[in-house]
Amino acid sequence: MKIWVDADACPKVIRETIVRAAERTGVECTFVANHLVPVPKRNNIHSIQVPSGFDIADDEIVKRTEPGDLVITSDIPLADEVITKGGQALSSRGELYTKETIKARLNIRDFMDTMRSSGIQTGGPSALSQTDRREFANHLDRLLAKR
């Protein structure tokens, strides 16, 4: 298992949790973003900077993901592509997307996009809470223990 992180929108506190887990377990971890993401100098922790542009980082992650890999993302379409390739996808709030749940999440996302494009203000996600951080760390630990 390798960990791929959609680092463009990944909160710093979640990136730090991922780095600690990678250091502790030795799992290979790569942060992918269209900007420089500083990572500690470790043999198993890497950063890839892709050109700026719509979904370029997502496309790079999908291209490199192999069955059994874990992708950290809150991007629902990216999670769907990863699951289709046989990978796992975990949100920065600790929600594990599955084959059974991802289509419903895509439908909700598309509905909210339609609402926003028609001028209805839907608001954004709430701030990352301490509970979200704990859920993420616990779920990540469980996934790494299974590998």
UniProtKB/Swiss-Prot annotation:
Signal peptide: none annotated. Pfam families: DUF188. InterPro entries: UPF0178 (IPR003791). It comes from the Bacteria. PANTHER family: UPF0178 PROTEIN YAII. Belongs to the UPF0178 family. This is UPF0178 protein VS_2364. The lineage of its organism: Bacteria, Pseudomonadati, Pseudomonadota, Gammaproteobacteria, Vibrionales.
